[in-house]
């Protein structure tokens, strides 16, 4: 019997009571890992669904806990599916654990989904953003900063050239806005001081972009894909630091985003590898109150956080993801 290991261990995005009530028979086994009905993180729910579908197809399915699993643990598996991924490993153990995590996935004899190579490619945002630019996709003007060696004067030239009065700085390996900062009227001192802080916090690379005033007014359009097909899309805005979620009202814009998303997935499949799942986020800047002037790809996630609220299709992605993963390893 072949073994599938599912990398889990977050404490994020617990499933709703409604989801638990409907699927309690598939989730009750999680109590052996001290995960109870009052708080089941999304990745444990995904693990449960992969376990259900995998066992139906003759696989043994085991958890691999992202903050502690070793190469020995990984090598007990024939296949590994990452839900808890590199950014989480950095969050729990800094650069040391992130490096260990990536080395385990690189060295294991198991076949890893998504591969270590593509995980690293997406985590290192400067790599995939350069890829998007090369392929002709719209991205916002971005300055990439290596915290081991950078020139503040070059950064200021980029700011002056693009006439930026407000900028945002976001580190690679940052998640849930960790390390994200908006800087008004940027100066060499403000930038240098913040980059020093990020380096001291363990980050290695940073993206600097324009702060787009209209960004939050119309929000991001987040599109979730599995098996090359779009399952759902929703709009996210921010109010007092909290996410506000709603349906996308501009259907034409949504169709355009989906068309670009499908093309991007085809390109990634051709140039890198076929993805079991992916979330592609689009953002707009506006020139009026009715229609987006120009939209761009703001972010790609290949191990996205998936909830069970209405705007994320009530957790249907868990079943779709599990079926597509098992289908892929059986093919």
Describe the role of every protein-language-model region.
Residues 5, 79-83, 168, 207:
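Structural motif
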Residues 1-7:
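Extreme N-terminal starter segment of soluble prokaryotic enzymes
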Residues 15-41:
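A solvent-exposed, charged loop/short amphipathic helix patch at secondary-structure junctions
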Residues 12-13, 37-150:
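Conserved N-proximal alpha/beta basic substrate-recognition cap immediately N-terminal to
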Residues 63-66, 208-210, 272-288:
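A short glycine-rich, hydrophobically flanked beta-strand micro-motif that places a catalytic Asp/Glu
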Residues 272-275, 284-331:
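C-terminal active-site "lid" helix and adjoining low-complexity regulatory extension at the edge
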Residues 132-133, 159-178, 203-216, 234, ...:
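ATP-grasp fold ATP-binding core
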Residues 178, 182-271, 286, 295-296:
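Phosphate-binding site of ATP-dependent enzymes
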